[in-house]
Amino acid sequence: LDENRAFAELFRDVDESTPVPTCPGWTLRQLFRHVGRGDRWAAQIVRERLDSYLDPRSVEGGKPPPDPAGAIAWLHGGAQRLIDAVELTGVQTPVWTFLGTRAANWWVRRRLHEVAVHRADAAIALGSDFTLEPDVAADGITEWLERVAIQAGGEGTPLPLEEGDTLHLHATDPGLGEDGEWTIAVEQGRIAWSHRHGKGSAALRGGATELLLAILRRRPLAETSVELFGDDAVWERWLAGTPL
């Protein structure tokens, strides 16, 4: 809910037709609707204990009202719906997700990181500062890698790493411990990763929030304080082969 409120604050008294450069073709209006409807989509999946895909266009109350105050209330309401649905249904209740059946509370974590990254999109579009607690940013990297490990190479697409190459990420924020390190490689034809320390063919070192924005292509490395060591081509291949 805190992330939802922080996202909403960026949309008070803004020009909703402002383009969002990190989401090509989108405006702030579309980004706002996407986030609000996404929370309601997840809430409906959980509340109805769905075991198959739900078309987001059919979500109940999927469009915000036209007045700004009503739209903000609609946004907050979507996040609350998800929390309520998980509590009512049970955190371990199996439901549909785009990665297969997962416990209902999987959606809370997914939506937290979805909204955080889209808050970064809005902040970049508006030229505003973006901050995120390092532990949240680090978990965002972990959650994203969990998805990449499942989805990369699907439908015959090339893997974002070549056999024998490794990528190491190191978040320098105090207190993260092993949760702030990720070593990514190819094992048995699939992307695999762990929190163990290692030396990669390419390595990135910097704050967790800047690392998150870099791997999700929200900020080019040149606009961050993240340091890149090793083979630039490994990093570029990784960027080109992974989703936004």
Describe each region flagged by the PLM:
Residues 38, 48-50, 56-66, 72-73:
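Soluble acyl-CoA-dependent acyltransferase catalytic core bearing the H(X)4D motif
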Residues 3, 7, 38, 67, ...:
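Alpha-helical packing segments of well-folded alpha/beta enzyme cores
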Residues 1-21:
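Short, Lys/Arg-rich amphipathic segments at extreme N-termini
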Residues 142-184:
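A glycine-rich beta-turn/hairpin centered on an aromatic-Pro dipeptide
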Residues 197-244:
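C-terminal interaction segments
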